[in-house]
Amino acid sequence: MNSSVLVVEDDPNVRTMLDELLQDQGLDVWSVPDDLSAYQVLSQEAKRFSVLLTDINLGSDSDGFDIARRARGLNAGIHVIFISGYPVDPRRFASEGGAFLTKPLDLDVLAGMVWAAAGEAH
């Protein structure tokens, strides 16, 4: 299965770690540091991705929830996994959908979640 993941993470160290982890899992990984870059990639390549892995707090006007809504508008089949180092109201996930992991990340759990989501997308 050729599964593509879009990673949106503003912390360069975390982004690099996620890239390496997911590439080592055999996934096609595209990563961007911010919302504007994510919107640009999605506008051109949204159908390519089976999974969006996005930080919630990106230090900009848009957050991971905004990116997820845009991604789903362009690719209804995309699965979303949110990550954050900050507390998030669980009711927000009930309305937004998607899976959620807190930082620091359990890399084995993350890899399993991405593969499960990628498998459902195909």
Model-derived features: positions:
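Conserved acidic carboxylate
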Residues: 9
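C-terminal output helix
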Residues: 105-118
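Two-component/phosphorelay signaling modules centered on CheY-like receiver
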Residues: 12-31
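Active-site residues of response regulator receiver
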Residues: 55-56
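Short amphipathic alpha-helix used as the core "switch/output" element in two-component signaling
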Residues: 65-76
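Acidic, metal-coordinating helix/loop segments flanking the phosphotransfer/catalytic sites
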Residues: 31-51
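Acidic catalytic/metal-coordinating carboxylates
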Residues: 34, 62-66
